[in-house]
Curated annotation (Swiss-Prot):
Top-level taxon: Bacteria
Top-level taxonomy: Bacteria, Pseudomonadati, Pseudomonadota, Gammaproteobacteria, Enterobacterales
Annotated transmembrane regions: none
Identification of the protein by name: UPF0401 protein c4569
Pfam families the UniProt entry points to: DUF905
InterPro entries: DUF905 (IPR009253), YkfF-like_sf (IPR038612)
Similarity comment: Belongs to the UPF0401 family.
């Protein structure tokens, strides 16, 4: 059994620090379209296909991404 625990985002907008914590915890979550102050957090499946993406400033970005992290997230070992 793995000692890895899921890392989730707040339900609303999220910071770069929070996004980096998620990308560090999951193999298939990436920061893309980085504009400095805003960026997208992207979840891809094992084949590399896009599953979901949200801008960090969207009102319910974390809530949407957390749902996909629970079903599609691949935790690092």
């Amino acid at each position: 059994m793995s000692d890895c625990h899921p890392v989730l985002l707040p339900e609303g907008p999220f910071s770069r620090e929070q996004a980096v914590a998620v990308t560090t915890a999951y193999r298939n979550v990436l920061i893309e379209d980085d504009q400095g102050t805003h960026f997208r957090l992207v979840i891809r499946n094992a084949e590399g296909q896009l599953r979901w993406r949200c801008w960090n400033f969207e009102p319910d970005a974390g809530k949407q991404l957390n749902s996909y992290l629970a079903s599609e997230g691949i935790l690092r070992q």
